[in-house]
Amino acid sequence: MLAASRSGLSVTELAEKLHTSKSTSSRLLASLVESGLVERDEAHRHFLDVRFWTWGVQAARRLPVLDIARPHLASVVKEWSNPASIAVVRGDQTIYLECLTPSNGDAMFNILSYAVPAYACAPGKAILAFSSDETKEAILSCPLKKFTPQTLATREELSRELETVRCQGYAINRGEYYDNGSFAAAVPILDHAGLAVAAVSFYGLQDEESLQRLIPPLVEIGEVISASLGYGKAVRDVVG
């Protein structure tokens, strides 16, 4: 409840959402505040404490795909002098875990911690296109919010887009969640069964020419990382 409320919750509001008494919600919140997991401001509204973020970072570091992808992505960031990111999809959200940015001929590693609807960004679409039918249906069957004029906010539009992504092997974002005039492209990282476990992307591309120039090396790095996870296109074609 607290994670879903950016403006925080009062004791009364939490009691209403949980369908419980104010005394019960007060005790729950007091315990969380005392343990350092929840913050309470001067207006007695409650918010998640940043400790949850540190726990999330530790959880992300346990993902094997990060250790495998990081050196490959660092190499391509240095070669092409363009920032890149690694993301996963959890539920209906794309969670950006790490990014690498060019810095004096090297690649600087940064931890990220923000989420975007899976259907409204390049990494999310790249992952969804190579996910199970059940995963795709869970997104397609939900209401799709239109964030910008470019957002694919109908089942038909998004279905066509995911099929295109699956055919070409990469996804493009031309301002579907936040239109700042730049583009992003992403490719899925596939496991031995051919299902996407993550995505890597180039972002901050300023024009169509830059976008098209960086798609081939991005596709290549996606194939290299996927092969490191056991994915092989020839085997996949045989076993389906």
Regions found by a protein language model. Give the residues of each.
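N-terminal helix-turn-helix
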Residues: 1-66, 226-231
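Short amphipathic alpha-helical signal-transduction/dimerization elements
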Residues: 3, 124, 128, 132, ...
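Charged catalytic carboxylate motif
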Residues: 24, 51, 68, 157, ...
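Short, ordered coil/turn segments that flank beta-strands lining enzyme active or ligand-binding pockets
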Residues: 42, 90, 192-193
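Amphipathic alpha-helical effector-binding/dimerization core
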Residues: 47-142
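Intrinsically disordered, low-complexity polar/acidic regions
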Residues: 147-148, 179
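Extended hydrophobic
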Residues: 154-228, 240
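Signal-transducing coiled-coil/dimerization helices and immediately adjacent hinge/linker segments
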Residues: 234-240
